[in-house]
Amino acid sequence: MSTETASGPTEDQVEILEYNFNKVNKHPDPTTLCLIAAEAGLSEEETQKWFKQRLAQWRRSEGLPSECRSVTD
């Protein structure tokens, strides 16, 4: 029986995503994102959405704006 709900990834999937976010890369390129998605058993779209939301959460925790603009803006 799966613990996955329509609201998001399972605990095991989050563990994989968090490991990659914290230890590998906060901004994975498309190839890396595809590999992370395959490892977690999620779609690339779900994985990309998770990374975008997690990055915004991390930026807020660091006292940075959730969306980063270019230094030339």
Swiss-Prot record:
InterPro entries documented for this protein: HD, Homeodomain-like_sf, HOPX
Biological processes, Gene Ontology terms: chaperone-mediated protein complex assembly; heart development; lung alveolus development; negative regulation of cell differentiation; negative regulation of transcription by RNA polymerase II; positive regulation of gap junction assembly; positive regulation of skeletal muscle tissue regeneration; positive regulation of striated muscle cell differentiation
Swiss-Prot/TrEMBL keywords: Cytoplasm, Developmental protein, Homeobox, Nucleus, Repressor, Transcription, Transcription regulation
GO molecular function: DNA binding; histone deacetylase regulator activity
SUPFAM superfamilies: Homeodomain-like
Origin: domain of life: Eukaryota
Location of this chain's protein in the cell: Nucleus; Cytoplasm
DNA-binding region: 3-62
Main subcellular localisation: nucleus
Gene Ontology CC: cytoplasm; nucleus
SMART domains: HOX
Known role: Atypical homeodomain protein which does not bind DNA and is required to modulate cardiac growth and development. Acts via its interaction with SRF, thereby modulating the expression of SRF-dependent cardiac-specific genes and cardiac development. Prevents SRF-dependent transcription either by inhibiting SRF binding to DNA or by recruiting histone deacetylase (HDAC) proteins that prevent transcription by SRF. Overexpression causes cardiac hypertrophy. Acts as a co-chaperone for HSPA1A and HSPA1B chaperone proteins and assists in chaperone-mediated protein refolding.
Subunit structure as annotated in this protein's UniProt entry: Interacts with serum response factor (SRF). Component of a large complex containing histone deacetylases such as HDAC2. Interacts with the acetylated forms of HSPA1A and HSPA1B. Interacts with HSPA8.
Protein's name in the database: Homeodomain-only protein
Record organism: Bos taurus
Lineage, top ranks: Eukaryota, Metazoa, Chordata, Craniata, Vertebrata
Gene this protein is translated from: HOPX
